[in-house]
Every structure is written in structure tokens, then in C-alpha cells.
Amino acid sequence: MASHIICYIFCIIKLSCAHVCLMSFGSSYRVGVHITHEKVAACPRQNQRLYSCDSLRILYHYSCLTTRDLLYICDCSDFENIICLIRLLLNLDFVEVKLV
């Protein structure tokens, strides 16, 4: 992977496991996502579908990507939302996810 020096966006969001492909690296995960919509505002009174706002009032909509470089494991064994710390590299399609 090419190195990039660029600003980061830090946020905490709830991920619906049914729509997140995880690749395990110990306590962290590599997630391939495609961000289709980004909204920075107060949380809506009713959550949209399976996604919810966090305390930072950042709402993301995304879907899993496929790539020949990574083998994805879609883990929905516990059917629970995963609360993660997301570090988003603005010019990449991949984010690093650490469970908190």
C-alpha cells in the first residue's frame, strides 16, 4: 500500500455488522468501505435504517468493497452493533477500525 500523508478524521460510530466486512489483526480490524454519504449535523430524531449517529454527530453511510488484495471476513455471529474508533484516510478506500 502506498504511503500517504494526509489529515485524519476521528469519529466514533456504530457499525452494523451485516454491512461491514472485517479482516482481523489481533484487536484491530481492516475494513473496506465505500462512503456514499457523509452528514455532519445533529442526529436525526429517528435513525436511518441500520446506521446511527454518534456523540460527535457524524453520520456515515457505506457499503463493503471487494478487492483482490484483501480477504474479507463478514462476522455477524453475535448480531450486535460494533462500536468502533474509525481512523479515516481521506484519499483511501480503507479505514482502520479498533474496537473500544
Swiss-Prot record:
Q: Which domain of life is it from?
A: Eukaryota
Question: Does Signal appear among the keywords?
Answer: yes
Localisation: Secreted
Q: Which UniProt keywords apply?
A: Antimicrobial, Disulfide bond, Fungicide, Plant defense, Secreted, Signal
| Signal peptide segment | 1-18
One Gene Ontology cellular component: extracellular region
Q: What's any GO biological process attached to this entry?
A: killing of cells of another organism
Q: Which family does it belong to?
A: Belongs to the DEFL family.
Q: Give the protein name, as stated in the record.
A: Defensin-like protein 316
Natural source organism: Arabidopsis thaliana
